[in-house]
Amino acid sequence: MKTLTRKLSRTAITLVLVILAFIAIFRAWVYYTESPWTRDARFSADVVAIAPDVAGLITHVNVHDNQLVKKDQVLFTIDQPRYQKALAEAEADVAYYQVLAQEKRQEASRRNRLGVQAMSREEIDQANNVLQTVLHQLAKAQATRDLAKLDLERTVIRAPADGWVTNLNVYAGEFITRGSTAVALVKKNSFYVQAYMEETKLEGVRPGYRAEITPLGSNRVLKGTVDSVAAGVTNASSTSDAKGMATIDSNLEWVRLAQRVPVRIRLDEQQGNLWPAGTTATVVITGKQDRDASQDSFFRKLAHRLREFG
């Protein structure tokens, strides 16, 4: 009897342990596959591609790569003497046409005052037409002067905002063309996190929900708020052929890969360039409130850390 009881006890204990293990594995699987988190997240920032609006030789480069600059700080300067001469020429044209317009205005006024009693209507009309032509030339010269002045101002390339100069690839003595990107400026205090969440996890992602961001290789946890969720992503399995007909890729019905949707997360505190734009992180959406880490069990903390390893 005792032997039978002992066997039943062992069987019952084994069965209970198996059931508990199954429940633990099932909960871990659900937690891993359905909870709103992703390792596919990246720090991003607003980046300005700085390109000159004039062409010429670069005479001075006032910054170095990865330097923190202030708004309106001079980055580099393009050949100013050429544009100064162009402005001087334009100003000389304006001065010439101003004098000429004054002469033609006096002549037209005199003829209009004398009237047809002293000269023909044709001569009066001719004087008025000449005045209008000169005034048109004066306006054109003034526009050319204003453009030359603008070009001269734009030979000095300034930072459009506070930020970090990166990928600086211009040097004094080089010729740069109009519109060619010379340097990128990563705006200060513009960093955010772009998390690519699987579509199966979007149920737990809403604008305003709180988020935890763990940079790769760091134990520090940053806080943030879901700012927005992308309204659509590209359908990679559907394209059009040369005649505009739909081309659909073949898929296995029993294998469905979840699409990833961009989710923009606003950081509570800007971290400068401690984690540069493009570096990766793990993001966990905790819901309407921040997670109280002090209340987490050992297994929950372990699950959070396992996310770092996939």
From Swiss-Prot:
Membrane topology recorded in Swiss-Prot or TrEMBL: Single-pass membrane protein
GO molecular function: transmembrane transporter activity
InterPro entries: CusB-like_dom_1, CusB_D23, MFP_Efflux_Pump, PHBA_efflux_pump_AaeA, RND_pump_MFP
Presence of keyword Protein biosynthesis: no
Keywords of this entry: Cell inner membrane, Cell membrane, Membrane, Transmembrane, Transmembrane helix, Transport
Family according to the record: Belongs to the membrane fusion protein (MFP) (TC 8.A.1) family.
Gene name in the database record: aaeA
Membrane-spanning ranges: 12-32
Subcellular location(s) of the protein: Cell inner membrane
Stated role: Forms an efflux pump with AaeB.
Organism from which the protein derives: Salmonella schwarzengrund (strain CVM19633)
An example Gene Ontology CC term for this record: plasma membrane
Protein name in the entry: p-hydroxybenzoic acid efflux pump subunit AaeA
Pfam families for this protein: CusB_dom_1, HlyD_D23
HAMAP family from the UniProt entry: AaeA
